Design a protein with these regions (language model features):
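Phosphate-handling DNA/RNA-contact segment within nucleic-acid enzymes
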Residues: 1-118, 135-136
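A charged alpha-helical hairpin associated with nucleic-acid processing machineries
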Residues: 28-29, 70-79, 106-122, 128-275
């Protein structure tokens, strides 16, 4: 049941899948325990271990902490997505209850659709190192297709070497929530992350910016947000909005985005795995 059954090792002997681990129950939105995460107490690998997937437990759908956050608030203003269930637990202990974590996977469309059932704003919280930024690009790409009017996606990056667990112990909940309040909106994150690589004041830089941002706009649903993104790109590149709309429409014939940052999850990551 929920992955607590014993397994056989290479010698054929039975053993407890989660032996010598701190257990974190993973609940669905109704509060039913559908899986577990286990954090090892020693230097044994892997550091984190999840229950195997079952008909009730799918990592690509479930969010650790969503049940608890939904119970704590009558109305959830926003949800902060962190990288591990230990982060969720420590933040809650320090008074920050609007946090959830994916279960060792990149955020999926299913995750985001579930989040937006309970709040209109999601804030991705990542470590400030290179791996964190690459994970943010992946979250950005996943978010584009569900950014309809009335929904908000933001990004916050912690100082390099810090994670939610360590930083809230240092600065406390009040200052941590100030960092949350200053999170970067998705539109600004797109332009800031791409513009940083090019001289957007030069013709070449403006051309490159257009080439990279247009495929991202194409992924967005029609609506006010998409229109405003085209307008913002027009101001930054001096291209007419009508021309940008034409170029966005042409992306229908392009099966692959021209913006493909080198996003990956480090093989030495401490994210949970199945076993």
């Amino acid at each position: 049941i929920v992955g607590l059954l014993i397994d056989r090792n290479e010698e054929g002997k039975l053993y407890d899948r989660f032996r010598n681990r701190i257990m974190f129950p993973i609940r669905d939105i109704r509060g039913r325990t559908i899986g577990f995460g286990g954090r090892v107490l020693s230097d044994e690998k892997p550091k984190y271990l999840n229950s195997p997937e079952t008909p009730l437990f799918h990592k690509g759908r479930e969010l650790y902490g969503l049940y608890e956050a939904n119970r704590h608030f009558r109305s959830i203003e926003n949800l902060i997505v962190v990288e591990g269930y230990m982060d969720v637990a420590v933040l809650a202990q320090n008074g920050v209850h609007n946090t959830v974590a994916t279960l060792g996977t990149a955020v999926t469309i299913e995750h985001l659709n579930k989040i937006f059932r309970y709040t209109s704003e999601v804030i991705f919280c990542f470590d400030g190192d290179e791996a964190g930024k690459k994970a943010a690009y992946r979250a950005l790409d996943t978010s584009l297709s569900i950014i309809v009017d009335g929904r908000s996606v933001k990004f916050m990056f912690l100082p390099e070497g810090e994670d939610p667990d360590t930083i809230i112990r240092k600065i406390g909940a009040k200052k941590f929530l100030e960092l949350v309040a200053n999170a970067t909106p998705l539109s600004e994150f797109i332009f800031e992350s791409i513009s940083a690589e090019y001289d957007h004041n030069s013709v070449d830089g403006k051309a490159k910016l257009s080439k990279l941002v247009i495929p991202l706009i194409h992924k967005m649903p029609s609506g006010v947000f998409r229109t405003l993104m085209i307008r913002a790109l027009s101001k930054k590149t001096d291209l007419e909005e009508s021309e940008l709309k034409r170029l966005v429409k042409l992306e229908n014939n392009n099966n692959q985005s021209t913006y493909t940052p080198n996003v990956y999850f480090d093989e030495n990551s401490e994210q949970p795995i199945d076993h």
